[in-house]
Amino acid sequence: MSVDAFIAYLQLEKKYSPHTIKAYNKDITAFTSFCQDHHQLNGIWNVNYPLIRNWIVYLVEKKVSNRSINRKIASLKAYYRFLLKIGDIDTDPLANHKALKVEKKIQVPFSENEMWNVLNAIEYSKDFTGARDKLIIELLYTTGIRRAELLNLKVVDINFSTKTLKVLGKRNKERLLPIIEHLENTLQSYLNLRNSIKKVAAEEYLLLTNSGDKIYETLVYRVINKYLSMVSPKVKKSPHMLRHTFATHLLNKGADLNAVKELLGHSSLASTQVYTHSSIAKLKEVHATAHPRNKE
């Protein structure tokens, strides 16, 4: 069966982002190619688990990480659940599959000092590009929004009267985020220069390229890497790391976990609890001041 119906289902019913749908499609296409090349199968709707296990072994031999393999399997699981739902298959070949073990890495966020430096010590150019670049970093750090949410922000989402920013999150769920004074100033500076762009092709979108088009993913990564490399030796620099830093800094300052969950747009508290593992410095500080052995 063609995956077209599945892709439409992800778009229309599940409301997945284009980025997520692209990843699902890529994983299913790769598995389809494996079945054709190694097992002479023209479709993947009637495969069994031993064949899928062969694919997993093939990926392991190709040095694909367990984390990546689990993601690929998750794409297939979603596809087979869909086929089961619409009655195209009778059994799910991945129903009893257990995810491969993945070593949990504690990601260390950027420090408060690094974030202060990138937003205050660095001198951004006074033109449109400098204002936009600073706004990208300021938005990601002070609101904790996702990369896709950043790309899709619109001018009308900003309400200076209520000092709130409307964000359209996963599955089209809206949430309002506070606009703090620093962010408000950066927004105003950017908007003043934004109006000077000769050609505004994507007028409704907040963040634009120098030619007036909607910004794209690679540009965001380039901006983050450029400026954070000036203040931090960390290798990994990404929109998600700034989101991670946002959550960790809030929790370090005693923010309520449920409040952070709402700010991040998480549907479950379990997703937010991941960030509590990063508050090592705060835990050490509490331990040092509270434990009797540290007072002897």
Go through each PLM region and give its residues.
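Conserved catalytic core of the tyrosine transesterase superfamily
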Residues: M1-E296
